[in-house]
UniProtKB/Swiss-Prot annotation:
It comes from Neisseria meningitidis serogroup A / serotype 4A (strain DSM 15465 / Z2491). Keywords: Amino-acid biosynthesis, Arginine biosynthesis, ATP-binding, Glutamine amidotransferase, Ligase, Nucleotide-binding, Pyrimidine biosynthesis. This is Carbamoyl phosphate synthase small chain. L-glutamine binds at S47, G238, G240, L267, Q270, N308, G310, F311. Belongs to the CarA family. Residues 190-377 form the Glutamine amidotransferase type-1 domain. Coiled coil: none annotated. SUPFAM superfamilies: Carbamoyl phosphate synthetase, small subunit N-terminal domain, Class I glutamine amidotransferase-like.
Length: 377
């Protein structure tokens, strides 16, 4: 017999459905993601910490789960909302059903609700707090208490919550059919990567391009990073509000003074922007999906990108030495900048995809080019 589940939003909206995961309760910011596939990568993306993810594609779980598609060491999404969980899963790589995976990772999830109605509501009113409760004793009143306790994503420094606690080395490259994860024979570039919630495919794409990575915790000082003598510094994606991450902003400012090539993605993009004096703002309509068109202003090309952020950089606050390189064609929000006087650039979306297209994978090549030029100088 199925277990009932309840989804309640901060605006008072109520959805009744079925529990498909761990029995219990959870709260967070409710967002929607338009990706058709990649649910396991989404669940394990640390950028979804404290967020309950609604997947707009109706059938989720068809291909099961496997150990190779993990983007971090655990599930970070606060909860999952879907329309329908198939009775069977089928894929040659599958080792576990989505239901069993959710239970094992203690992830609360709800199905059999009208996700079209929910998505429309979130699109019109914006992302908001919500709670999922399972079991016959779940009540709207209890959900409202959880929502009130959660509050808002504004002001939440989550990067240091999801970051590694110890420095570690990474050399593993991208996955290949029949070979698994391949480590390149030569890795001539040493990159220090800040872990603000880094996805493993970012590390793999850098490693496949010849980078030996030293991954450091979010609160590592610039002095400690420079002592490692890197060829370049990478600033990762991550969850939460970038403004409270003052430790990271100060470190980025000092690293930029060193002249080292720096590349930032997602939260890393926002931290670079804050470090040069720009401002960030909470988006009413956050970007979550694998089909977002972005224009590369240098080439004029339109690239399809994977996106996952609820904060954005205010383009009107950029200093004179910051050149805009990319913009969203959905809402014209800032997607990328490059400094004109330092080898520093960043991108709001996710070039590594996982899930999604890798149209902007060339940004990793640009970072390699900057390090190569710096080594020749």
């Amino acid at each position: 017999m199925s277990t009932p589940a309840l989804l309640v939003l901060a605006d008072g909206s109520v959805f009744h459905g079925t529990s498909i995961g761990y029995e219990g309760s959870t709260s967070g910011e409710v967002v929607f993601n338009t990706s058709m596939t990649g649910y396991q990568e989404i669940l394990t993306d640390p950028s979804y910490c404290k967020q309950i993810v609604t997947l707009t594609y109706p059938h989720i779980g068809n291909t099961g789960t496997n150990a190779e598609d993990e983007e971090s060491r655990s599930v970070y999404a606060a909860g999952l909302i879907i329309r329908d969980l198939p009775l069977l899963h089928s894929n040659f790589r599958a080792s576990e059903s989505l239901h069993d995976y959710l239970v094992r990772n203690k992830t609360v999830a709800i199905a059999d609700i009208d996700t079209r109605r929910l998505t429309t509501l979130l699109r019109e009113k914006g992302a908001q707090g919500g709670a999922i409760l399972t079991g016959a004793d779940a009540t709207i009143e209890k959900a409202q208490e959880l929502i009130a306790a959660f509050g808002s994503m504004v002001g939440k420094d989550l990067a240091k919550e999801v970051s590694c606690t110890e420095t570690y080395e990474w050399t593993e490259g991208e996955w290949a059919l029949g070979k698994g994860f391949v480590t390149p024979d030569e890795q001539p570039y040493h990159v220090v990567a800040y872990d603000f919630g880094v996805k493993t495919n970012i590390l793999r794409m850098l490693a496949s391009r010849g980078c030996r990575l030293t991954v450091v915790p979010a609160q590592t000082s610039a002095q400690d990073v420079l002592a490692l003598n890197p060829d370049g510094v990478f600033l990762s994606n991550g969850p939460g509000d970038p403004e409270p991450c003052t430790y990271a902003i100060e470190a980025v400012q000092k690293l930029m003074e060193s002249g080292k090539p720096i590349f930032g993605i997602c939260l890393g993009h926002q931290l670079i922007s804050l470090a040069i004096g720009a401002k960030t703002l909470k988006m009413r309509f956050s970007h979550h999906g694998a089909n977002h068109p972005v224009q590369d202003l240098d080439s004029g090309k339109v690239v399809i990108t994977s996106q996952n952020h609820g904060f954005a950089v205010d383009a009107d606050t950029l200093p004179a030495n910051a050149r805009i390189t990319h913009k969203s064609l959905f809402d014209n929000t800032l997607q990328g900048i490059e400094l004109t006087d330092k080898p520093v650039f960043c991108f709001q979306g996710h070039p590594e995809a996982s899930p999604g297209p890798q149209d902007v994978g060339y940004l990793f090549d640009k970072f390699i080019g900057n390090m190569k030029a710096a080594k020749r100088a």
